[in-house]
A protein has these predicted regions:
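Beta-lactam-recognizing serine transpeptidase/beta-lactamase-like catalytic domain environment
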Residues: 3-172, 213-214
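Short amphipathic alpha-helical face segments that pack within enzyme cores
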Residues: 48-54, 184-191
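Glycine-rich loops and low-complexity Gly/Arg-rich segments
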Residues: 64-65, 183-186, 195-200
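Short, gly/Ser/Thr-rich active-site loops of penicillin-recognizing serine hydrolases
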Residues: 76-81, 190-214
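Short beta-strands and strand-coil junctions in structured, solvent-facing domains, enriched
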Residues: 179-180
Length: 214
């Protein structure tokens, strides 16, 4: 993961921890349990919305390194040659398919972001970022989000790309203290998908008209 993109003011650094980092930063050895929780985004991992979006775009394109740019208008064209991040794309395909299933199968955590139009299938994954350590009392009380003090509520996350067969868009959503990613962030993503589809159709019609006029 890139530490910074340097395209926004006050952008924070990201962190994907490893054994060397922990030894240098904390003076302690890495333990197996940290490998397990790191795999699901817990532990010492730190990330920003732009980093999540960039990660999602690189999953969508099959694992090629890309750099975000702010485009002022539709006339700006970039023809960068992207560098592969990985030698094999098999694992990328597994992640792509899993994100598609999460969004388009009824039992998927991202199903609330699914569009009904079969022409536009997106692939996404929800996330819930824990804010406060869960105590034994918390487990016994089993409080709902609205019963928890606002500043202690989890952050709701969602990332996605699409359309699935020919990806053009990637997005990331973080709702601070929003609660569950599937309950809060995924429905918001659906509204964004609708806006993307509308814009996509408008642009497609514009391009077709432009070519007809030539």
């Amino acid at each position: 993961m890139y530490k910074r993109q340097d395209i926004f003011d006050n952008e924070k650094k990201g962190l994907v921890p490893n054994t060397e980092w922990k030894k240098n930063a904390l003076g302690r050895n890495w333990v197996l349990g940290e490998t397990i929780i790191t795999g699901i985004g817990q532990g010492f991992i730190q990330t920003t919305p732009i980093q999540l979006c960039l990660m999602t775009a690189q999953i969508a394109n099959g694992g090629y390194k890309i750099y975000p740019k702010i485009v002022a208008n539709d006339d700006n064209q970039y023809a960068d040659k992207f560098t592969p991040l990985y030698k094999k794309s098999r694992n990328i395909k597994i992640v792509q398919d899993a994100m598609f299933s999460s969004t388009n199968e009824v039992r998927g955590t991202s199903y609330r972001s699914r569009l009904d139009d079969p022409k536009y299938r997106f692939a996404g994954k929800t996330g819930t970022s824990q804010v406060k350590k869960i105590t034994e009392l918390d487990r016994e009380l089993d409080l709902k989000t609205f019963q928890i003090p606002y500043e202690e509520r989890d952050h709701a996350l969602y990332v996605a790309f699409g359309p699935y067969k020919s990806p053009r868009y990637a997005l990331s959503i973080i709702i601070e203290h929003g609660g569950s990613g599937g309950t809060v962030a995924a429905p918001l993503a659906k509204e964004l998908f609708k806006m993307i589809v509308d814009r996509h159709e408008i642009r497609k019609n514009y391009d077709n008209k432009k070519y007809l006029d030539i």
